[in-house]
Amino acid sequence: MSKKNSIWVGILHMGLGTVLAQMINIVVQPILTRIFPTETLGIYTYLISLATMIIPVASLKLDMLIVSEPNEKEAQYITDACIIINILISLIYAIVIIVGYQVSDNNIFNKYGIIIYVVPVLVFTNGLRFLFISYLNRYKEYKTISIIAIIREAIRAVIQVGAGFLSLGVFSLSMGYAVSPLFGLNIQMRN
């Protein structure tokens, strides 16, 4: 396949995968607003916002180097370093949350109780997600990236909607966001 055609195939795979994944999200959001109380959705959004402040830098953006590193061995070292850094950042954030939760009764970490402890898990699993997207991007595995995005959103939707019908609350909403990237990792490991 020519380089020009492979670029278009990559664009098609990434574009279609992104659109389908977002369509799942667009369809599920109104369902979630009907089956979860407003307060539960608000707490969930709060937890996600605390996680998304850290997720983009969970590996200190070193995952970007994986794509461009010409040496395979060096790329593997970078990947390993990113995993370790992601673990460390998640643990540091967990410590900050634990200390913040214990120090005062009136701060952002103890506003909604112990549910705050799910945030470092969100950081860790989604940090891994971005790391392995970079790894797949290195090998131009755009179709796999798209399939993983679709499956991740579908699994998140099933977990969250199922939790809503079972009245499981904000923890289950958060777990949908935390667990769904792991299914993508499972697919990637098989490739």
Language-model-detected regions and their locations in the chain:
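C-terminal transmembrane helix end/exit motif
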Residues: 3, 63-66, 131-138, 142, ...
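Signature of the first transmembrane helix
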Residues: 5-60, 94-101, 122, 152-157, ...
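Membrane-interface helix-capping segments at transmembrane helix termini in multi-pass transporters
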Residues: 7, 34-45, 69-81, 91-124, ...
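Short alpha-helical transmembrane interface motifs in multi-pass membrane proteins
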Residues: 9-14, 47-51, 84-85, 113-118, ...
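Transmembrane alpha-helix boundary/hinge residues in polytopic small-molecule transporters
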Residues: 27, 61, 65, 127-132, ...
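Alpha-helical transmembrane segments of multi-pass membrane proteins
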Residues: 53-54, 95, 99, 108-136, ...
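Helix-loop junctions and terminal segments of transmembrane helices
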Residues: 55-74, 137-138
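Hydrophobic alpha-helical transmembrane segments
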Residues: 113, 117-120, 147-191
